[in-house]
């Protein structure tokens, strides 16, 4: 069964830099995830940087993220694919976010966001490719 989880739960109010909960992905078959960052509210003159980090132990997440989502300024949804199929040591994922605010008023940044991951199902080896279908017609 495909995994579906949130690294940043829906309607989370982000007002300071932080880390999300650690999620165990060791039961994932494909180890490939469709990521959706949705920003539902924000104020002007601020930015949000979100990244996804991996760990073998659930404790040490290293010095470099597995995925950096492009910097966000406005409401909307950004979609990306995270593929850790070649990183067999990665058993846990966690989101990290950094907020930046500039301007003259209210120095506290604020975003309401969600980062949801859906496992991409593994492709069946029995599914014929287009090339195989065309070769069979020749």
Question: Which role fits each region the language model picked out?
Answer:
Residues 49-53:
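Beta-strand signatures of extracellular beta-sandwich domains
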Residues 30-37, 86-113, 118:
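Noncatalytic modules at the cell exterior or secretory-pathway interfaces
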Residues 1-30:
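Transition segment at domain starts
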Residues 10, 63-74:
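Solvent-exposed serine/threonine-rich low-complexity stretches and specific carbohydrate-binding patches
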Residues 41-46, 105:
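A short beta-turn/strand-edge loop motif at beta-sheet boundaries
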Residues 21-25, 76-86:
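Exposed aromatic-hydrophobic patches
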Residues 2-4, 8-13, 102-138:
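C-terminal interaction-tip segments
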């Amino acid at each position: 069964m495909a995994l579906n989880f949130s690294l940043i739960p829906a309607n989370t109010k982000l007002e300071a830099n932080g880390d999300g909960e650690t999620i165990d992905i060791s039961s994932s078959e494909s180890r490939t995830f469709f990521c959706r960052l949705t920003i539902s509210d924000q104020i002007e003159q601020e930015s949000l940087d979100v990244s996804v980090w991996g760990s073998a132990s659930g404790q040490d997440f290293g010095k470099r993220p597995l995925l950096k989502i492009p910097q966000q300024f406005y409401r909307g949804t950004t979609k990306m694919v995270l593929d850790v199929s070649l990183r067999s040591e990665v058993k846990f994922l966690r989101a990290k976010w950094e907020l930046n605010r500039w301007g003259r008023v209210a120095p506290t940044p604020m975003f309401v966001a969600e980062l949801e991951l859906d496992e991409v199902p593994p492709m069946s080896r029995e599914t014929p490719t287009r090339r195989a279908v065309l070769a069979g017609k020749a």
